Amino acid sequence: MNGNKHLLGFDYAYHISKLLFEQLEELVTGALESMKTGTVTDSFEKLIFAAIAITGIVSGICKGSNQCAIAHKFYEECRSFFYENTLNFLHGELVAVGLLVRLSYFGSDCAYMINELTTLKLPKCLSELNIPTDAVEKFADELCNSSAINDTSDISRKRMLDALEIIKK
């Protein structure tokens, strides 16, 4: 724990998120099988509960601090500017690609996330979302102008363009 009373919630949110991620990893295979067979299993119920309720708790603890704002703004830009292209994708699929951008923007290694998306047969790049790769310029502008970044300086734009390289295929 960092001891700063203003950041204490983030410490708790981090640990809850870590536990949530570990639980989701354990449950996802069984939940996907449950979905394929059309049966509601314990794994499926636990995964749905964790994904909705626990994520809501973490969000509440963080008081809307933009913890995944880049990922959600990416989703919004997909729906705003590439609606027809992304019509057949779920909210979570678009946010997952946005998470790659967020991880890259903050300097995290994306290999694990890319591997997980590949294993689950989920999109991980613009071409898999039916979005042209030259759209990175549009995404960079929109994301830098959004409440997620709110910095239109050349340095910020370059950092965002660099982050978007992870999904430019």
Q: Residue locations for each model-derived region?
A:
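Active-site segments that bind and position negatively charged phosphate/pyrophosphate groups
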Residues: 5-116
